[in-house]
């Protein structure tokens, strides 16, 4: 194999949830990410980060990939700094206070959804390698009424909830960090997701 191809660390925030665990399974089974030029970048570490403990679904190592789990608070800057500990890293940012929770606790939604996301972006920016971020946004950025059946990048964002506002802001920040070439960022707007039982 080509020794110049960087081995990638994959960080999944919200890694204890349904989507995070499913994503981890797919990536571990596949064993590589696909780079910008279409080249395979082997994964050597997957870190599942979440605010709560989750069922143990993975071994400590599978197919040469080290699998680690960390519990912590994404709105703590030092915690985030510890997660972004190398240059060649791809972050799948799924961690979020959900819509109902954001309406009940504005400050929590701002801390987790906005500050946590911004800390990830800033820590990625501080590195100089192949830093990528895929952010799970939401159709909540469009609000509800009057949304067209087909939504392109030019449709105006009119969020009606704190959750939708935090998602829209982070999308804009990711676009700007990418424009400035601090990292390579993408946002994927998911439809309504069935959340895990219990907290959070």
Residue ranges, per PLM feature:
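Conserved glycine-rich Rossmann-like NAD(P)H-binding loop of the short-chain dehydrogenase/reductase
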Residues: 32-55
């Amino acid at each position: 194999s080509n020794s110049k191809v960087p081995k990638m660390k994959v960080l999944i925030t919200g890694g204890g949830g349904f989507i995070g665990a499913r994503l981890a399974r797919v990536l571990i089974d596949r064993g590589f990410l696909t780079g910008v030029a279409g080249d395979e970048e082997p994964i050597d570490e997957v870190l599942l980060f979440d605010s709560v403990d989750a069922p143990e679904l993975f071994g400590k190592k599978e197919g040469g990939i080290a699998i680690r789990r960390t519990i912590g608070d994404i709105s703590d800057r030092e915690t985030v700094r510890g997660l972004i500990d190398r240059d060649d890293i791809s972050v799948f940012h799924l961690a979020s206070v959900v819509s109902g929770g954001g309406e009940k606790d504005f400050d929590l939604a701002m801390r987790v959804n906005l500050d946590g996301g911004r800390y990830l972006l800033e820590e990625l920016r501080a590195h100089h390698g192949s830093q990528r971020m895929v952010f799970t946004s939401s159709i909540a950025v469009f609000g509800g009424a009057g949304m067209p059946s087909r939504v392109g990048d030019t449709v105006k964002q009119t969020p009606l909830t704190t959750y939708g506002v935090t998602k829209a802001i982070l999308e804009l920040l990711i676009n700007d960090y990418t424009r400035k070439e601090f990292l390579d960022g993408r946002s994927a707007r998911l439809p309504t997701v069935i959340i895990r039982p219990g907290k959070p």
